[in-house]
Each structure stands twice: as C-alpha cells, then as structure tokens.
Amino acid sequence: MNINATLFGQMVTFALLVWFTMKYVWPPLLQALEERKKKIAEGLAAAEKGKHEMELAEKRATAALKEAKDQAAEIVNQAQKRANALVDESKEAAKIEGERILANARSEIDRELENAKEELRKQVSALAISAAEKILQREVDQKKHKEILAGLGKQLG
C-alpha cells in the first residue's frame, strides 16, 4: 500500500471534516433532535393530560346531568304535591261552602215553615174566633153547631 500525499490529504481533510462536524454541525443537530424529542414528549404528555381532563370533564358533566335530573324530578314532585294540596284545599273549601249554603237553605226553609205555621195559626185562630162569634150570636143548637164546624172544616181543608 502506498501512502502518498493524496491519501494523507484526504485523511487530514476527513479529520477536519469530522472535527468541524463534531464541533459545529453535530451539537445543533443533537439539540434539534433533543428539542424535537422534548416537543414530542410534551405533546404526548399534553395529549395524555387532555385525555385525563376530558374523562374528568365527562364525569363531571355526567354528575351534573344526574344532579340536574334529580333536581328536576324533585321540582316536579314538589309541584305535583302542591297541585294535589291545592286540589284538596279547593275540595275542602267547596265542601265547606256547600255545607254553608245547605245550612243557609235549611235555615231559610225552617224560617219559611215557621212563618207559614204562624200564618196558619193566625188564620185558624181567626176562623175559630169567627166560628165562636157565629155560634155565640146564634142560639145554642147542636145541629147548627155541627153544620158550622163542618163548614169550618171545609174552609180549613
């Protein structure tokens, strides 16, 4: 093997190229690779964190939805109870009002009945007095008394 100046020049040039590459080219390449690796790792971590946060958000949303449904059901139940209470109150008020009206009507009927009885008593008294006057004005005759009383009975009946 023949070592000549060309081979020696090539070796020196190669060594200078390796040194230059190691000194000036290789560190920025390694730095770029490290930065890229770091960015990829950060991206994966961010994706994992985002996935975890999304799962937490879904859980929170599910819990909030369940709570909202429970609250809505409770509101509906309370509204139903209130409506039933209002219906019951209305029924009770209507029953009380009906009983009051019925009591007033009975009272009015009783008053009218008493008035009618009183009027009938007055008329019977007047007829009895009239009959007694007629009996006393006439002579005492049993046959006439019977006729007068029969006539009085017809007037009453």
Curated annotation (Swiss-Prot):
Oxidoreductase as UniProt keyword: no
SS bond partners: none
A single Gene Ontology CC term: proton-transporting ATP synthase complex
InterPro entries in the record: ATP_synth_B-like_membr_sf (IPR028987), ATP_synth_b/b'su_bac/chlpt (IPR002146), ATP_synth_F0_bsu_bac (IPR005864), ATP_synthase_B_chain (IPR050059)
GO MF annotation: an example: proton-transporting ATP synthase activity, rotational mechanism
Keyword tags: ATP synthesis, Cell inner membrane, Cell membrane, CF(0), Hydrogen ion transport, Ion transport, Membrane, Transmembrane, Transmembrane helix, Transport
Transmembrane domains' residue ranges: 7-29
Topology term for the membrane: Single-pass membrane protein
Localization in the cell: Cell inner membrane
Chief place of localization: membrane
Cited PANTHER family: ATP SYNTHASE SUBUNIT B, ATP SYNTHASE SUBUNIT B', CHLOROPLASTIC
Subunit: F-type ATPases have 2 components, F(1) - the catalytic core - and F(0) - the membrane proton channel. F(1) has five subunits: alpha(3), beta(3), gamma(1), delta(1), epsilon(1). F(0) has three main subunits: a(1), b(2) and c(10-14). The alpha and beta chains form an alternating ring which encloses part of the gamma chain. F(1) is attached to F(0) by a central stalk formed by the gamma and epsilon chains, while a peripheral stalk is formed by the delta and b chains.
Xref: HAMAP family: ATP_synth_b_bprime
Function: F(1)F(0) ATP synthase produces ATP from ADP in the presence of a proton or sodium gradient. F-type ATPases consist of two structural domains, F(1) containing the extramembraneous catalytic core and F(0) containing the membrane proton channel, linked together by a central stalk and a peripheral stalk. During catalysis, ATP synthesis in the catalytic domain of F(1) is coupled via a rotary mechanism of the central stalk subunits to proton translocation. Component of the F(0) channel, it forms part of the peripheral stalk, linking F(1) to F(0).
Similarity comment: Belongs to the ATPase B chain family.
Protein name: ATP synthase subunit b 1
Source organism: Methylococcus capsulatus (strain ATCC 33009 / NCIMB 11132 / Bath)
Gene responsible for this protein: atpF1
